[in-house]
Every structure is written in C-alpha cells, then in structure tokens.
Design a protein with these regions (language model features):
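Glycine-rich cofactor/substrate-binding loops
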Residues: 2-38, 92, 99-100, 266, ...
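Charged, flexible cofactor/metal-binding loops and thiol motifs
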Residues: 118-126, 130, 145, 153, ...
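A short linear-motif detector with a strong N-terminal bias
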Residues: 25, 82-84, 94-95, 238, ...
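A helix-coil-helix interface module used to build multimeric assemblies
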Residues: 1-203, 208-212, 276-277, 292, ...
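Helix N-cap/coil-helix junction residues
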Residues: 51-52, 219, 379, 400
C-alpha cells in the first residue's frame, strides 16, 4: 500500500479492508494521460501565479513529460498499490524530481482534478466513438445503394403496412444513428468546461488564471460555481444517455435483422462470417453478434440508471459516492465501441433477397393506395377508408388480393374506380405516389442517400 496523499491527519495506518474498498486505481488508471495533461497545465498556471519558481516549474514539467512518455510506451507500468491515478502520478513525480513534485498539488483538490480528468477523457474518446458510428452509417448507406429499386413491406405493430424501398428502410437506421452522433457532440460540448480553480469546494486561494488554463487545455469556458463543479457529473450522465440511446438504436437494428434474416421472413441473409452454428443442430445459422448487441443494450441503459440513482441523493459538494461514475462510464464506452464494430461488420456483409421482399410488398398492404385513389376521384377520405375496409374484408374471406380483381369487380365497390386503377395500385406505383421529401419516393430516397454521402465525406 503506497502512502496516501491525506495521511498526515491520521495517527494509524488505514485498515486494508477499508482502504482497499476505496481504491480506484485499477480502473481510473485509464485517466493517466488526462491526469498528466492536466497537471502540466496546472504547473504552468502555478508558475504564472508566482507560486512556483522557474526551477521547480521546469523540473515538474520535465518530470511529467517523462512520466507521460513512459506510460504511453509501457501501459503495464501504470500499476501499483496507489489509491488512485492522481496518487500514482504524484508518487512517480516526487521520485523523479523530489520536493518540487510535492509543490504541484498546491491550491488544487482531487475533487476538481478528477472532474478535469473525466472531462478531458470524454473530449478525447468521444470522437473515436463517432468514427465508429460513421462507419456503421456508411455500411447502411452502402447497402441502400446496392438495394437499388428493390421493394419491401414496411411494418407497424409488426404487421405489414405499406410498400417502401428497401433502401428507405436501411436509411431509417442511418437516420437514427446520425442523431446519436449529434448527441455525442452535445455530450462532448457539455464536458467542455474547465473545473480547475474550484478547489475542494470554495475555490482556490491562489491567483490562478483560469482563462489561461481553459485556453491551454482547449476548454470553451470555465465552470460558473465552485460548489457545483465539485459534485457535477451531469456531463457524465449526458454521455451515458447518448450511449444508452445509441445502444437502443443498435438493439432495434439487431432485432430487425434477427427477424428478417430468419426463415419466416427471408428478406436478408447473414454472411457465414456474421453467424455461428449450433453444437447439436447441424442446420443452424445463428445471428449471435446481433443477439449480443441486443443484449448489451440493457447493460448500457443500466449504467445510465445507476449513475442517476447515485447522483440523486447526494448533498451539495463532493462525496465519495461519485467514485462510482467511472466504471459505468468506461464500460459504457467499451460496450458501444464493440457493438458498433460488430453491427457495421454484420450490416456490411448482408445479402438481400429482392424477390422475396417484392412478393411480400404486394397484396392487401396496398389498401391505403386504393383509398388514396378514391380520394383523388373526389370521395372523402373517411368514406374511402370505409369502402376499402369492406373490400379488404371480402378479399380476406375469398383469400384473394387487389391484383386479382377485374375492372368490373373493382367497380362493384365504387363507380369511381377507372380504367387506370390496376396500374395505380401496385407496390412500385405506391412508392412513386409519396410526395414529401422524407418519404420513400425514389427521388427522395436518392436525395437522402446523397445527403448522407456528403455528410460522411465531411467527416
């Protein structure tokens, strides 16, 4: 057990059972780079404030740079019996530069230090998740382009609804993932505030130039209130919310393709490299990667819920409960990263069966188009809905669909059906009849795909 940074107050060594319970170094070692980065800036701020002389400031900076370089080259070196990553860095610094290293923590609390480290960490790591999101979105865009003018049914209540282009369905998932990308931008911006200068809770008694520190570390602003800063984990909760919603959307992707690659749908087929088999049943081709993505969504949601419950009962100011922010945050990041990789790999190799989807896109799901046809001939929509509903009921009883009707049979339901009804009531005509820019009209889908390509190209 390394000597604790706070040991001067106590006349006996910590009970290992109690001390070890509070040790966070095994997981907060991930903040090593951010902790050193923050300490380098803090040392410079202390020197500018006249708290450190030039010799000590130089020694501290040189020592921290050496520590950072070794940690990057030898990640396994970042270990030991320290209480946390802050203690590890300070111990290594003192070992290198002596008493100068003991001056580094002047005017600074670990309360603000850990907040700084987490903010720096999220600013550094969120763009990596966004890269993976873009790769997954690109996989959907590629599949949408390959799908061309293939048709499929859309679903509400998991019942066939209206014909759509397969590409429109694929781009619906890309649209949701783009919102996740934007939410991560917002989470990064929320974290982009400098907490240094807040001290343990009341601020620091040294003339620290926080504007300089913010600029040095690339922060957009300085926090407004030192008491709030010491206990603020809103930015961590916002990140977990963004991750949880991303995982919800990936879970929906997984659910769709678990269903649609099964024999009952057969719309798509998983590549052999995207599936596993059964140890007992030789015929099985199981969507294990998708099922794991779906399962891991609950894990991410749990991390968000757990942090919110941790935060909700705390009095104002720092409390040790907040140590429980890091493990869920790190695991949520890891979970989203591997889930995005797996999803992009599976989607990128999907095989479409356009004949199967086209057959499923015909039949009674053209009922809305039949009603719209009557509306175009002057019938009020509510009356058209009633007429077409009666037609559907009769066709179901006769085990037929609209395509089997002769013109005479059409006109038995309404004299408004004209010679063009059979060409107007097809799946292809249905998608061409959509008018709005967000619709499944081929031109709208082509424009949406082009816009996504442009967005991806901009990075």
């Amino acid at each position: 057990m390394a000597k604790a940074l706070w040991s001067g107050r106590f006349d006996s060594a910590p009970d290992p059972a109690a001390f070890d319970f509070g040790v966070s170094f095994p997981f907060d070692r991930r903040l090593f780079e951010d902790d050193v980065t923050g300490s380098l800036a803090w040392a410079e701020a202390l020197a500018r404030a006249g708290v450190l002389d030039a010799a000590d400031a130089t020694a501290i900076a040189d020592g921290l740079h050496a520590i950072l370089e070794r940690g990057r080259k030898e990640p396994a070196w970042i270990s030991g019996g320290d209480e946390d990553v802050h203690s590890f860095v300070e111990r290594q610094l003192v070992a290198r530069v002596g008493d100068a290293g003991r001056r580094l923590h002047t005017g600074r609390s670990r309360n603000e230090q850990v907040s700084l480290d987490l903010r720096l960490y999220l600013r550094r790591r969120i763009p990596l998740l966004q890269q993976k999101l873009r790769a997954t979105i690109a996989a959907f865009a590629d599949q949408a382009e390959r799908a061309g003018d293939a048709l499929m049914p859309s679903y509400t209540h998991l019942r066939r609804a209206m014909p759509v282009l397969v590409s429109h369905f694929l781009l619906s998932h890309a649209a949701a993932l783009r919102r996740d990308h934007a939410r991560l931008d917002a989470a990064r911006e929320e974290a982009n505030a400098l907490p240094l200068g807040s001290g343990a809770i009341a601020g620091t008694g040294y003339a620290i130039d926080t504007s300089f520190l913010a600029a040095k570390l690339g922060f957009a602003r300085v926090v407004a209130n030192s008491m709030d800063a010491s206990s603020d984990r809103d930015f961590a909760a916002s990140f977990l919310h963004a991750v949880a919603l991303s995982m919800v959307h990936l879970s929906r992707v997984a659910e769709d393709f678990i269903l649609m690659t099964g024999e009952e749908f057969g719309f798509f087929e998983l590549a052999d490299s995207s599936a596993t088999g059964s140890s007992m049943m030789p015929q099985k081709k199981n969507p294990d990667p998708l099922e794991l993505v779906r399962g891991k969504a609950g894990r991410a949601i749990g991390h968000l819920t757990g942090l919110l419950v941790t935060m909700k009962g705390l009095p104002t100011g720092y409390n040790k409960d907040l140590q429980e922010d890091k493990e869920p945050l790190f695991d949520a990041e890891d979970t989203l990263a591997v889930s995005l990789d797996a999803t992009a790999a599976v989607i990128g190799k999907l095989m479409l069966h356009p004949g199967r989807t086209a057959r499923a896109a015909s039949g009674l799901l053209l009922a809305t188009d039949v009603a719209d046809y009557l509306v175009s001939r002057g019938m009020p929509f509510r009356q058209a809905h009633e007429v077409v509903g009666a037609m559907v009921r009769r066709l179901l009883q006769e085990k037929r669909d609209f395509e089997s009707l002769s013109l005479e049979q059409w006109r038995q339901s309404s004299d408004l059906f004209g010679d063009d009804v059979k060409e107007r009531v097809t799946a292809a005509a249905s998608v061409r009849a959509r008018k709005t820019p967000q619709s499944t009209h081929p031109d709208a889908v082509a424009a949406a795909l082009a816009e996504i390509r442009d967005w991806l190209a901009r990075g």
